[in-house]
Amino acid sequence: MKIMRKNHPLLKIINHSFIDLPTPSNISSWWNFGSLLGACLIIQILTGLFLAMHYTSDTTTAFSSVAHICRDVNYGWLIRYLHANGASMFFICLSIHAGRGIYYGSYVLSETWNIGIILFLTTMATAFVGYVLPWGQMSFWGATVITNLLSAIPYIGSTLFEWIWGGFSVDKATLTRFFAFHFILPFIITAFVLVHLLFLHETGSNNPSGLNSNSDKIPFHPYYTIKDLLGVFLLLLALMILALFFPDVLGDPDNFTPANPLNTPAHIKPEWYFLFAYAILRSIPNKLGGVLALILSILILAAFPLLNVSKQHGLIFRPITQTIYWIFIANLLVLTWIGGQPVXYPFTMIGQIASITYFAIILILMPISNTIENNIIKL
């Protein structure tokens, strides 16, 4: 078997990626979230596949087909809630994974980092079209409001959003194509994940110290396979607690009402993991400006490798940038909170301050603190 896994064309790839892979001996639990994201993706694809067997993408039957899944299909309620809450777990792991990348300077591996940003955007698109499928009030109005933002694009905007809608309003054609997108995108994500791993294994993984670890590496199996399995079991435990005890805690009560184009909810908002970007969008009074800020709030992650002027790798020995990093995380949490609040004073003002702070930290404060720390080292 040993010879086979090293010589067989297919097993050789698996062996070099998950068994004999030389891995830094000091990587902490923060490095577990990559494998947890893989576990989340598998859970989402499997539960989604079973849901797709019973779901109908028609405006007249979509809402009742979801109710049918929960009431009449064997363990349909469990599959549905695992899928819905699995998306939340996915974004929690994704946020921590990206946060760890920023903290420990993993963005210097620019190909891996940029594929990660593409993965983040694709996952957001998948989650958005998936949120529309139950065809509840918030699904319908969320789809209407967010897709309407495309009309802000000069010249082609109105044509573009009518083309995406498949008509002059969000209707049957929109739901059908959103279901098609939601079905195909996870497989595109899987392909990008393989490219992400390919680039990662070209350079090797980063480590907490930020130093070169070539002199001290251990095989991935059994050390990190056991460590990752523990993480997966804890993830499953958290997901099962969420799905079995608090299944609707992260959902919106408006989505228990079938979609009604004649009745607008008091406060239209997306899922909780989009609220930070939604707050940035709302903080700019101009429609086109808001859309650009929304897109830049994600694409600005690509600026990290370009703005990095530090002579040290990661933030572990850099107290000034460390402080700014944790202010950045706190600011993100404030934006998430503001995104869920109604558009009224003082929430709009807090949102505008937090949005300016978000961009200022990345574009101004972090490069300045890097330069200050470089000068301190010279002293």
Curated annotation (Swiss-Prot):
Other noteworthy facts: Heme 1 (or BL or b562) is low-potential and absorbs at about 562 nm, and heme 2 (or BH or b566) is high-potential and absorbs at about 566 nm.
Entry superkingdom: Eukaryota
UniProt binding sites for heme b b566: 97, 196
Family, per entry: Belongs to the cytochrome b family.
Gene Ontology MF annotations: metal ion binding; ubiquinol-cytochrome-c reductase activity
List of residues binding a ubiquinone: 201
Signal peptide: none
Protein's UniProt name: Cytochrome b
Organism of provenance: Thaptomys nigrita
Cofactor(s) required for function per UniProt: heme b
Disulfide cysteine pairs (residue numbers): none
Membrane topology recorded in Swiss-Prot or TrEMBL: Multi-pass membrane protein
Keywords linked to the UniProt accession: Electron transport, Heme, Iron, Membrane, Metal-binding, Mitochondrion, Mitochondrion inner membrane, Respiratory chain, Transmembrane, Transmembrane helix, Transport, Ubiquinone
